[in-house]
Structure formats: structure tokens, C-alpha cells
């Protein structure tokens, strides 16, 4: 089960306050995306693209499908089942991939396939990260068209300004403004509920939509066309995957309470309220969200909606930084500069490269599609693809759990694979209408991640093939020992059994050895955090030479000097930061058509490797203590 952050010790009242704070915080961060779905879900369902007439039976059928999608996909699948699979308290597709791989034989074909699924799921997440800010903010600003139609020409420019300010502000962090996210989003949800009740009171028969029979009748009446309409229905559950992805920040308990007692009831009320309005006035389908708002509250609602969509976008941008950081740690993407924006919260980071790539892609989406209706056709495919992959990974993970009855597991697999496949199919058939955009983004990212992963393996194999075994090198070196100089030399190496290139270059050109020599290997675990007792492994191999393994979880920021400081506490190596020099190899990649990858992928890997952030910043190594020695490697 998930590890909910422990409240401060004290009275039960303090514990209750802590839980309340977590619930409000979860509402602001976790539910921003799904909370802004009412802006466009019903509008998209009745867009000309689907050819539906907003008559009584059709409206109730769509509302029934929306409500039961929320119940099945979010409440049953994510809240009840998926959130039980935590990786030391962490959730998300990368964490679930690691859990699923643990149940499979190491190095097996199935483990490789699961890794591919995880990479593709993470790639789709970034595609979602482009569409969500674009469609959310654009939908909110489109309220100006309802309030003053003459402002229609200003919708896209205003959207670009809002998004530009949002991305430009990332470098300053969100620690201060983030405290307001929960209360603002809470006001947003209660406003949704109030508007829903206001409209339901005028057409209470809309409550019949809670009966799933209306959803069944919709399928009976519309046959295969109903499956096509699922492409709009799924917009109501976009953001549901955030419940699992953000589990490590707030804990499963707070997220479940937020969903059950605030988010689900308010979403149900607002969808029913929009449906009640359409039952009374079918022309309101042009923008049922804003048409449902009383005229006196329209401008305040536009402001509140814009704030809510900015918060939803912020949560997803922050999530993109987190996934990128995890992917770096797990070796799926090159090292990038990471800036910590908070002195008190380690998880608050800013990744400039990710930020500017997201801004560029979001701006292209806003300008290219132009309105939320067009963007909606592109939206669902990345979300449903991620949801489908999550179900597959969950089945693989749960299959190895003896506490899960086999009939229950296969029932889960049958029901949710069918639901996820139906939603995915309904979106993939919109490929030419816009679904190609997030798929193209996902494919580009998938190619980059696979190329980096494969290239790193080829590079490692090439270095190992040409390398000299440490166990045979050291005895020969001691037969004619070079001059020793005071201090400690730390050689960063991926393979602790082979002599690092940096050591060979140092001996060749400087003809000296340091008093103490450490061969340091940094390992990233499949878990989010490394236990204190397993952080460091020190092996003395004679004559002041040491092998040191430093382990970090994929959620941690590697700090090599700090880890070595702790080696003194363990009684291993004497370590003085001011008397230590770090040596690292900086390989220059030479592409070859006769090796493991096509020449274009070799060149792509060489480009990525050349532009990767140096080890100095990534491992927190002081720049004035680092010596990088070049080596040319052909792959």
C-alpha cells in the first residue's frame, strides 16, 4: 500500500489538520486536469464531428456514459485497484514498469517487452503534457466568445500570452504560489457543483442519466457509431492517471478522500447540470459549460476557469519534470541540467530543456489547431494509450502476487482491457483529424529514448571490449609503481571490473598516481529511494585502491560527494573534499554503419551524447574538482 506522508507528532487534532492539508493539496495538484474536463467534454460530444442530435435520449445516454466512465475508469480502476501497486510509496507508469519487471526473469524477452511498454507509456505522457495545457487554457479563454462574440479573434493570442507567462515563470519555482493551488481549485470544484445544482433544479429529470441503462440504450440505438462517440466521452476521465502518478506526493489516503468526497460529487453535478441545460435548450450545445453559467457570473467564471486551467497545466508541467528526472536516473534519456527551486522541498525542480520544448510544442498545438474543438480530436489518444499500457503492466505485476485470486485478476483484465481498448480505438480512428499529433510527439520521444538506451549499451560494451581487467592491471602496476602524490583520486566508471579510461590517460600523460584511488560506480535502483544501509558498498582491493558502489533511487538526486563523506562514517575510506580530485572520461562518439544500430541512429546518439549535461552538475561534483579526459569510441 502507499506510504502516506507521516503527520507531525502530536495530538489527533494535529493529525486531522495534516490530513486536511494533504486533501486540499491533492485537490490542487492531482485533480486539476480532470477538474477542467467539464469545459470541453459535453461540447465535444455534441460537436458536428460526431453528428449527434441533442434530443432527450441522446443527452441522457451521453451523460450516463460520462458518469459510468468516471465510476469505472477512475473510481474502480485507479482509486480501488491501481493505487494498491506502489513502489515504496511512489506511483506512475515508470514506477509500475519497475514493479512489473521485478516479477520477470532478469534479462528475459518478457522483461525487455515490459521495458518497451514503459518507455512508450512515458512518451505518450509527454504527448499528453503538450495537449493538456493547450486545450485547457484555450477552452477557458473561449468563454470570452460567449460573453462578447467580437473578442473571438483575440482568443488564440490571449491563450499564447497566458501559456507563455506560465512557462516563463517556471524558473522561479512554485513553492509560494503552489500553496494557493489547493484553495483555488477547491473553490473551482464547488463553483462547478453550484452551477450544476442551479441547472438541475430546472430539469430534475436529468438524474435518470445515473441509470446505466441509458448508456446501454445509447449503444443499442447508435450501434458502432456509439464506439466512435467514446472518443468524446473519454475526455471526462483525462487526468485520471494523475491519481496514480502523484501518489508519492500526497499518499493514497488523501487522494482517495479528495476524489470520493469532493471531486467525484462536484464533477457529477456539473455534468448533470450541463445536461439539464441542453434538455431545456438544445442550442446550448455550442458551449454548454459557459451557457450554464448565469449571466452575472460569466466574467468571474472565465477568470476562475483560466486560473483552474493554469493550475492544471502547472501540475502537468511539474509532472513532466518529475518523469524526465526519473527517466534520466533510469538511463532512458541523456543527463540534463536540473535546477532545484525550493530549499525545503526536494521534489520541486525545474528542467530548462523540458520546459522550453514543452512551450514550443504547446504553442504549435494552439496555433495549429486554433480552437478547443479541433484540439479535442487530438487529445484522447495519448491518455487512452497510457491507460491501456497501465492496465497491461498492472496485470503482469498482480499475476505474481499470490494474494490476488486468479479469477479476480482475469476479471479485472477482461473488463478493463475491453474498456481501455474501446476508448483507445475510438481515439485512434481520429488519426487524420488530429490524433496524429500526440502520436507523432510520442513516437519522436520513444525513438530518442530507445536510441539513447541502446547507444549507451553499445558504448558500454565497446569500452568493456577494449578495456583492461582491473584484477590483472593492478598487480602489474605494482611491479613498477609510479610516483604517488598526496590526496584522493575518484574515477567515475560504469564498469568497476575494468580500468577506467581516465586512469589510463592520467598514467600515460601525468605518470603519477594519487595516494588513494577510488573506482566509483553510481547505480540507480528500481525503487524510488535507497535504504541508508544499502546506499554505499566499499571494497578494498589493495594498496589504497577501492571499489565503491553508490546507490540512488530513481526519485533521488545523486549527490556523490555527500555519499563519499558518509564513507568516513562507515570506517571505509578517509575522504577530505578539499583534497579530492574527480576524474571522468568524456567519450567522443564516432558513428559506424557496421555496428549495432543504423547509421542515422548512431549519429542521433552521438548528437545526444555530445549535448548531455556533464557529470559535474548531475552528480553534484564541484566543477573545480573535476578533470575530464577525452576518449574516442566507435559504435
UniProtKB/Swiss-Prot annotation:
Keyword vocabulary terms for this entry: Cell inner membrane, Cell membrane, Ion transport, Membrane, Potassium, Potassium transport, Symport, Transmembrane, Transmembrane helix, Transport
Cellular location(s): Cell inner membrane
GO terms under cellular component: plasma membrane
Family of this protein: Belongs to the HAK/KUP transporter (TC 2.A.72) family.
Membrane topology: Multi-pass membrane protein
Record organism: Xanthomonas oryzae pv. oryzae (strain KACC10331 / KXO85)
Designated name of the protein: Probable potassium transport system protein Kup
Catalytic activity: K(+)(in) + H(+)(in) = K(+)(out) + H(+)(out)
Matches recorded under InterPro entries: K+_transporter, K_trans_C, K_trans_N, Kup
Gene Ontology molecular-function annotations: potassium ion transmembrane transporter activity; symporter activity
Segments traversing the membrane: 22-42, 59-79, 111-131, 148-168, 180-200, 216-236, 259-279, 297-317, 349-369, 378-398, 404-424, 428-448
Function: Transport of potassium into the cell. Likely operates as a K(+):H(+) symporter.
Amino acid at each position: 500500500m502507499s506510504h502516506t506522508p507521516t503527520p507531525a507528532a502530536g495530538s489527533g487534532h494535529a493529525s486531522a489538520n495534516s490530513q486536511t492539508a494533504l486533501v486540499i493539496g491533492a485537490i490542487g495538484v492531482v485533480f486539476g486536469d480532470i477538474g477542467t474536463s467539464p469545459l470541453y467534454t459535453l461540447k465535444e460530444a455534441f460537436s458536428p464531428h460526431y453528428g449527434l442530435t441533442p434530443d432527450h435520449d441522446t443527452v441522457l445516454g451521453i451523460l450516463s456514459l460520462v458518469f459510468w466512465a468516471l465510476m469505472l475508469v477512475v473510481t474502480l480502476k485507479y482509486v480501488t485497484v491501481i493505487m494498491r501497486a506502489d513502489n515504496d510509496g511512489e506511483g506512475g507508469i515508470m514506477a509500475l514498469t519497475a514493479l512489473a519487471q521485478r516479477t520477470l526473469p532478469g534479462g528475459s524477452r518478457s522483461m525487455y517487452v515490459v521495458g518497451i511498454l514503459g518507455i512508450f507509456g512515458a512518451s505518450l505522457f509527454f504527448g499528453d503534457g503538450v495537449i493538456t495545457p493547450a486545450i485547457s487554457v484555450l477552452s477557458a479563454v473561449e468563454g470570452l466568445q460567449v460573453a462578447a462574440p467580437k473578442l473571438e479573434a483575440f482568443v488564440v493570442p490571449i491563450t499564447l500570452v497566458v501559456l507563455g507567462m506560465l512557462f516563463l515563470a517556471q524558473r522561479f519555482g512554485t513553492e509560494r504560489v503552489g500553496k494557493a493551488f489547493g484553495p483555488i481549485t477547491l473553490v473551482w470544484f464547488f463553483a462547478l457543483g453550484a452551477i450544476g445544482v442551479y441547472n438541475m433544479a430546472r430539469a430534475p429529470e436529468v438524474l435518470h442519466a445515473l441509470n446505466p441503462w441509458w448508456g446501454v440504450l445509447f449503444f443499442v440505438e447508435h450501434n458502432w457509431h456509439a464506439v466512435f462517440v467514446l472518443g468524446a466521452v473519454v475526455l471526462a476521465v483525462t487526468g485520471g492517471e494523475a491519481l496514480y502518478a502523484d501518489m508519492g506526493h500526497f499518499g493514497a489516503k488523501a487522494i482517495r478522500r479528495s476524489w470520493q468526497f469532493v471531486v467525484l460529487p462536484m464533477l457529477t453535478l456539473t455534468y448533470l447540470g450541463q445536461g439539464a441545460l441542453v434538455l431545456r435548450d438544445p442550442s446550448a450545445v455550442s458551449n454548454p459549460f459557459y451557457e450554464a453559467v448565469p449571466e452575472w457570473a460569466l466574467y468571474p467564471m472565465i477568470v476562475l476557469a483560466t486560473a483552474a486551467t493554469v493550475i492544471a497545466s502547472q501540475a502537468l508541467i511539474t509532472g513532466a519534470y518529475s518523469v524526465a528526472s526519473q527517466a534520466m536516473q533510469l538511463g532512458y534519456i541523456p543527463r540534463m541540467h536540473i535546477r532545484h527551486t525550493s530549499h525545503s522541498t526536494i521534489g520541486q525542480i525545474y528542467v530548462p530543456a523540458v520546459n522550453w520544448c514543452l512551450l514550443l510544442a504547446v504553442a504549435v498545438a494552439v496555433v495549429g489547431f486554433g480552437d478547443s474543438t479541433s484540439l479535442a480530436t487530438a487529445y484522447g489518444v495519448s491518455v487512452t494509450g497510457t491507460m491501456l499500457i497501465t492496465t497491461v503492466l498492472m496485470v503482469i505485476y498482480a499475476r505474481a502476487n499470490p494474494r490476488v485470486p486468479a479469477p479476480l485478476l482475469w476479471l479485472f483484465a477482461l473488463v478493463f482491457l475491453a474498456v481501455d481498448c474501446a476508448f483507445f480505438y475510438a481515439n485512434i480512428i481520429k488519426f487524420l483529424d488530429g490524433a496524429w499529433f500526440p502520436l507523432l510527439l510520442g513516437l519522436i520521444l520513444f525513438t530518442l529514448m530507445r536510441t539513447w538506451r541502446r547507444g549507451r549499451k553499445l558504448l558500454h560494451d565497446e569500452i568493456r571490449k577494449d578495456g583492461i581487467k582491473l584484477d590483472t592491471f593492478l598487480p602489474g602496476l605494482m611491479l613498477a609503481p609510479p610516483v604517488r602524490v598526496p590526496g584522493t583520486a575518484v574515477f567515475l566508471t560504469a564498469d568497476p571490473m575494468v580500468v577506467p579510461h581516465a586512469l589510463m590517460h592520467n598514467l600515460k600523460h601525468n605518470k603519477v598516481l594519487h595516494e588513494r584511488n577510488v573506482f566509483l560506480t553510481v547505480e540507480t535502483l528500481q525503487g524510488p529511494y535507497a535504504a541508508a544501509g544499502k546506499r554505499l558498498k566499499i571494497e578494498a582491493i589493495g594498496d589504497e585502491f577501492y571499489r565503491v558502489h553508490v546507490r540512488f533511487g530513481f526519485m533521488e538526486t545523486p549527490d556523490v560527494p555527500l555519499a563519499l563523506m558518509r564513507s568516513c562514517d562507515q570506517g571505509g575510506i578517509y575522504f577530505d573534499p578539499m583534497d579530492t580530485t574527480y576524474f571522468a572520461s568524456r567519450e567522443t562518439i564516432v558513428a559506424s554503419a557496421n555496428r549495432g544500430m543504423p547509421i542515422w541512429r548512431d549519429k542521433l546518439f552521438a548528437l545526444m551524447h555530445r549535448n548531455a549535461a556533464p557529470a559535474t552538475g548531475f552528480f553534484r561534483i564541484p566543477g573545480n574538482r573535476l578533470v575530464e579526459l577525452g576518449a574516442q569510441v566507435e559504435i
